[in-house]
Design a protein with these regions (language model features):
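Non-catalytic, usually N-terminal nucleic-acid engagement modules in DNA/RNA processing proteins
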Residues: 1-114, 125
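Short, surface-exposed basic-aromatic patches at helix termini and helix-loop junctions that form
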Residues: 20, 117-121, 143-147
Length: 165
């Protein structure tokens, strides 16, 4: 089984600086990188000097969703801006990520499906996300029909270990 470490770029670099012997796999969030003028076109340049085996691009939909929830109660977050789907598609195409996750729509399985099908038509092999509690057989069959040959399970970030099982 392959494991990918998620976290901010600062966490990644701190971890990599202190654990440089073993190759690592990273999950990089578009929500945190979208404002960067530098496209992640070469993982070797971005992670220069670190032993990064591969990395996956995540849409960051949950980060944006969580920021929107904070904004509703008067708290601010720099990641609360919505994600421009066209920009995400182009960003993913230009990146050197080994895989990318589709732009899921929290609480809207049909919106998630529409986004994924658009990404697939644009040539991305985006990994579909099926959120916790929304896994119907038809949704699983649809996700399996895509080009990624993988399925992600979403909606578990705030679940306990027992709930995730």
């Amino acid at each position: 089984m392959k494991m990918f470490m998620a976290g901010s770029m600062m966490i990644h670099k701190t971890f990599l600086r202190n654990n440089h012997r073993e190759p690592v796999r990273l999950l990089v969030s578009y929500a945190y990188r979208k404002k960067s003028p530098k496209i992640l076109h070469e993982s070797k340049q971005v992670f220069k000097g670190y032993n990064v085996e591969e990395w996956i691009l995540d849409s960051g939909a949950f980060s944006v969703y969580a920021a929107e929830q904070k904004a509703k109660v008067g708290k601010q977050s720099e990641y609360g801006e919505s994600i421009d789907h066209d920009h995400y598609i182009e960003y993913a195409k230009k990146s050197a990520a080994s895989h990318c996750f589709g732009l899921d729509v929290i609480g809207d399985p049909e919106g998630t499906k529409n986004n994924l099908e658009r990404e697939w038509r644009c040539g991305l092999h985006s990994i579909p996300t099926i959120h916790f509690g929304q896994a119907t057989q038809s949704r699983i069959d649809w996700a399996k029909s895509g080009p990624a040959n993988r399925i992600a399970i979403g909606g578990v970030a705030r679940k306990t270990y027992k709930e995730r099982l």
